[in-house]
Amino acid sequence: PTYYSAHTTLFPPAILQEGNYLKAYQPKLYVHPLAKITTIYDIAYNRVVEKQQGHGSCGLGFGATIARDRDEVYFYANDLQFPWVIQQRLQSIQNFYQSKIAQQPQAVQEYYADELQHYDEAYFIESCLNIKSFYEIAQLAQLADTYQHFIFEGSQGILLDTQHGFHPH
């Protein structure tokens, strides 16, 4: 099975797309309840920061999601069970980034707005709800006796880690 730990992030529309593609193989996906959820707001902000700094980024919002979580603006896998919680989390995250972007030059604000131009929040919420059939919430300790091997998601960027990897980070 594949496991997303509390130290990684997932983007529900991508999980939905991958789950639909792999459905015939009946993949087993387990997610820690505190795995962080990446939103389009995280992705847009990540791209804005990357455009300013030019450090190298995959542009998928990983760093922004982790930083947002450290700033105590949370959205976890466990929240995906409740539509009203998803909506509340998205509103909080949108407000969080709006306040950060409002302090930036006009060109940065425009770039952020452009990144969000085609965002469909209803589709994002629908993706959050529709991925339920592709995963189970579980802590690794609960699964250790059931499986001998796991594929841990989220380790692909280790060589871009600013302390352990290679330039560009």
Question: Predicted segment positions?
Answer:
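Non-transmembrane, aqueous-exposed alpha-helical and coiled segments at domain scale
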Residues: 1-169
